Amino acid sequence: ERAMSIINDAAKWWKPQSVAAPVAEQPTEPAAPIQPTTPQTTLENLIAKSVAELSVNSVMETAQPFIEKYVADNFGILPKTIEVKTETDTKKVTGYTHHEFETVLKLVAADIPVFLTGPAGCGKNVICKQISEALGKEFYFSNAVTQEYKITGFIDANGKYQETQFYKAFTHGGVFMLDEMDASTPEVLVILNAAIANRYFDFPVGRVEAHPDFRIVAAGNTYGTGADIEYTGRFQLDASSLDRFAIIEVSYDNDIELAIAGGDKEVIEFIHAFRSAIVAADIKFTVSYRAIERLVKLKGMFDTQKTIQLAVLRGMEKDDANMIAKNLPKISNQYIYELKKMLKK
């Protein structure tokens, strides 16, 4: 479309210049038309330039996936730079970010409450910290809340108000993260729901208006439907309250895993195979980013079998480990080989 636009514009200019000159009254031969060499050259240059630009773009589109693969194979996953536009300026975020980072960032920047759900150790807390840094806001954190005062604060015996992380974020502005919201008592959601809906809240020290920069992100291991076999002690969250949150599923990110492993694809291949074998064996066990980090740190200190035992198995019952080993694929991987060999002893 861009090329055709250039050609059409050039053709409009070319047409009036292409008229032949008048013929003399008594020539022995008809006069030759004046050749518009300059316009022709201009048109050809426009066409050539357009085609060249399209060719470069086409080549780059084709080559980009291969270039990225070459870089990843030889140097590992490189940090990315993401530009964040706020109301006042533009900031750059450089580093390893989860593939859902930009989505969550846009939601938080737009003052939309977010609920991140995903397995333990998949980076939900890290996403929130990176978002607060990207937006230039303070980060406030609270784990599962089972008592209301841990959100609202309280007046102590000396008559002094004891502030909470939620109170500070609500009054001074910042990103407040409530981790394990599905492990918090349902009364907590009622409080958050009221604060989000009204933009004010009645704390023990009186009514407080929400700061314009107050943002909230919650996280959990379930979708708020209650406890399951893997995650016990979880509450069913109130549907009307949860409806105020944009729900984002956060899974393990392959690029982050590869970065943690220092580009060691054999480690990541083993971790992915181990997770799949856990599911196939119907065993409840978590292998998070932390397992990869331990595996990389310990592999130079111990032999492979001891490293697997300390970094991944971590006291797992031998029967469970055998069930998982039976479901591991038959591929050339030293970690899979050593695990199976260890369990045969």
Regions found by a protein language model. Give the residues of each.
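C-terminal regulatory/interaction module of P-loop NTP-utilizing enzymes
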Residues: 3-345
